[in-house]
Structures are given as structure tokens and as C-alpha cells.
């Protein structure tokens, strides 16, 4: 486990905007409680609460990855409109202590689904 610091900063802030996630016109998530995670030089990622996500459209997959700063990630596919978008969502169900704010949140790959921030 590594801790965020000057060489690899990670910040988590409440997003004041509404965040809507869709796939093929189907709303997967819609929230005013998203968290914006900024990590080093990577693009910002919106983490959406599970409670604001239509979990009935998601199917857990066997894929897992490990981040030395956040922990082990689990993945979901979106199943909507008869189509499956493989491993389009990840989540840290038991993140490392420095990242506990993202517990219970989902992140979405912007090249697989549409993520909109609405004022």
C-alpha cells in the first residue's frame, strides 16, 4: 500500500454539479452526490454513489485489478437494451484507509459510456 503524497497526489472532492451516466440512451446513474477523484496527472474521475445507480443494469464480472494507492478494484458490465458493455465500471469495495471516501461508489470508463456534468 502506498500513500498519496507530493510525488503522487490524490484528491477527492464533492462535485457540485449533477452527474448523469448513460449508455445507448439508457440512464445508468444520475446523482448530485458524485465525488471527483484527481490522481497525479490522470484525468479526473467521477465516483457515483451506488444508491444513485440503477444496479439492475449491472452485472458483476470476474475482472479485478490492483492500485497501490486505492486497493483492489472489482468490475461490472452494463447490460441495457439487449447489449452488454463489458467491464465498463469499476469500484473499490474495500479501499485502503486513505481512500475510504470512495467506498460505495462506482466509476465509469468514459470511452464505454457517456458521462455528463449538468450545471
Which residues fall in each region the model found?
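Terminal leader/tail segments of proteins
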Residues: 1-119
